[in-house]
């Protein structure tokens, strides 16, 4: 699961996918 934009999030995730606040 991710946000509208794929960029660096605030979370420990291998793949930066989210709207900034990580929704992985």
Curated annotation (Swiss-Prot):
Domain of life: Eukaryota
GO BP annotation list: lignin biosynthetic process; methylation
Keywords in alphabetical order: Lignin biosynthesis, Metal-binding, Methyltransferase, S-adenosyl-L-methionine, Transferase
Pathway(s) per entry: Aromatic compound metabolism; phenylpropanoid biosynthesis
Molecular function as annotated in GO: caffeoyl-CoA O-methyltransferase activity; metal ion binding
Keyword Methyltransferase belongs to the record: yes
Cofactor(s) demanded: a divalent metal cation
Cofactor remark: Binds 1 divalent metal cation per subunit.
EC number: 2.1.1.104
Catalytic reactions of this protein: (E)-caffeoyl-CoA + S-adenosyl-L-methionine = (E)-feruloyl-CoA + S-adenosyl-L-homocysteine + H(+)
Further remark: On the 2D-gel the determined pI of this protein is: 5.2, its MW is: 30 kDa.
Protein family according to the UniProt entry: Belongs to the class I-like SAM-binding methyltransferase superfamily. Cation-dependent O-methyltransferase family. CCoAMT subfamily.
Function text: Methylates caffeoyl-CoA to feruloyl-CoA and 5-hydroxyferuloyl-CoA to sinapoyl-CoA. Plays a role in the synthesis of feruloylated polysaccharides. Involved in the reinforcement of the plant cell wall. Also involved in the responding to wounding or pathogen challenge by the increased formation of cell wall-bound ferulic acid polymers.
Identification of the protein by name: Probable caffeoyl-CoA O-methyltransferase
């Amino acid at each position: 699961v991710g946000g509208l934009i794929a960029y660096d999030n605030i979370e420990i995730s291998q793949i930066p996918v989210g709207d900034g606040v990580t929704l992985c």
